[in-house]
Amino acid sequence: MTAASRANPYSIVSSEEDGLHLVTMSGANGFGNGKVHTRRRCRNRFVKKNGQCNIEFANMDEKSQRYLADMFTTCVDIRWRYMLLIFSLAFLASWLLFGIIFWVIAVAHGDLEPAEGRGRTPCVMQVHGFMAAFLFSIETQTTIGYGLRCVTEECPVAVFMVVAQSIVGCIIDSFMIGAIMAKMARPKKRAQTLLFSHNAVVALRDGKLCLMWRVGNLRKSHIVEAHVRAQLIKPRVTEEGEYIPLDQIDIDVGFDKGLDRIFLVSPITILHEIDEASPLFGISRQDLETDDFEIVVILEGMVEATAMTTQARSSYLANEILWGHRFEPVLFEEKNQYKIDYSHFHKTYEVPSTPRCSAKDLVENKFLLPSANSFCYENELAFLSRDEEDEADGDQDGRSRDGLSPQARHDFDRLQAGGGVLEQRPYRRESEI
């Protein structure tokens, strides 16, 4: 039996689009049989895949005044081109304002008259027109100091304006530098290197149906105190007939047990056990295909370099949740280290033995679950890994015609018959909660 033929019972999903079609139909005892059908059209997202909220504000009273009242946050939030335009205009306006003031002082003092008709010291040396006053304003605020133009003791008001312009220039510089640094160091940019799987999956874990999705960190720098949470968002009508378009329900990811706090060094599968307290308790595979809800997942933590809190968000619509699938392993042990293969991060494989019924029916009707010793994809991968190691060691004695040793063939037959679980091999399962 070849490796390719052994992998045939499992359908590998390589993309989100393919995953929407690999859905099993009902079979005996509530289990699927691998048939294919299509899903309904997607609803509008509340949170996009990139974490942006799909909302638009309208009819806000005094919006401009409120945004201007919090000018610093406004400058940090707006786009770079608008922020640079605002500061450029601020500098230009201050130069023009003080240039006009120095020009008015020169006119009032008679400094613009011909030199032979003045007979007194000017307020600002070498200022004979508005352009010269404007250049003096720029030199004062930027401390260029060419040396041709300077204020004298003749006019105290000119001295006062030089001091005032220096203070205004420092304020603008400080505000601009602070806004630029805050914008560059914003922790939300760290969220660009935090990854969520394209799909969530529902599968059995320790005899219970669980909702699972995968998170990963693309940088070697850690997310300190990382923790996850999730909410189910769906429309609801109350007992009084009130319609709530986006009702938010918490989804437990192990808060009471501390399982929501994760060590995000390698990709981790987040797990929500579908029990009596879960909003998904009564949802079966058929309900999932027609239901209208969205699961918003959030990963929070502190950036190691700056200790600032960052948040990464994503969401899964009902048609992005693959029932009866599991994630492919991405973490492998290789020589003296662990290797993470991100090409498998979004991939899933189908588990035909997953019950099609809801977790509620599974508990109440006591459907028979597959044996804990049944052959699974991870065991098959470990089996192939051991086979490859045997070949690398040059142990070719006793090989059968299809490339397997008698002991390997015995293990394989025993696993297919449900006789036991393959012992742990160098290729191991991914880190999971």
UniProtKB/Swiss-Prot annotation:
Look up the record and report any one GO term of the cellular component aspect.
plasma membrane
SUPFAM superfamilies on file: E set domains, Voltage-gated potassium channels
Locations listed in the record: Membrane; Cell membrane; Cell membrane, Sarcolemma, T-tubule
This protein's UniProt keywords: Cell membrane, Disulfide bond, Ion channel, Ion transport, Membrane, Metal-binding, Potassium, Potassium transport, S-nitrosylation, Transmembrane, Transmembrane helix, Transport, Voltage-gated channel
Tell me which species this is from: Homo sapiens
Binding residues for K(+) 1, per the UniProt record? T143
Residue sites binding K(+) 4 per the record:
G145, Y146
Asked whether the keyword Cell membrane is assigned, the reply is yes
Q: Which InterPro entries match?
A: Ig_E-set, IRK_C, K_chnl_inward-rec_Kir, K_chnl_inward-rec_Kir2.2, K_chnl_inward-rec_Kir_cyto, K_chnl_inward-rec_Kir_N, Kir_TM
Instruction: Site Role in the control of polyamine-mediated channel gating and in the blocking by intracellular magnesium: give positions.
Output: D173
Chain location of the short sequence motif Selectivity filter per the record: 143-148
**Cross-referenced Gene3D superfamilies:** 1.10.287.70, G protein-activated inward rectifier potassium channel 1 (2.60.40.1400)
List the ranges annotated as motif PDZ-binding. 431-433
Identify its membrane topology class. Multi-pass membrane protein
* Residues binding K(+) 2, per UniProt: T143, I144
User: Disulfide connectivity?
Assistant: C123-C155
Give the record's GO biological process terms: muscle contraction; potassium ion import across plasma membrane; potassium ion transport; protein homotetramerization; regulation of heart contraction; regulation of monoatomic ion transmembrane transport
Family per UniProt? Belongs to the inward rectifier-type potassium channel (TC 1.A.2.1) family. KCNJ12 subfamily.
What's the protein called, per UniProt? ATP-sensitive inward rectifier potassium channel 12
**Entry superkingdom:** Eukaryota
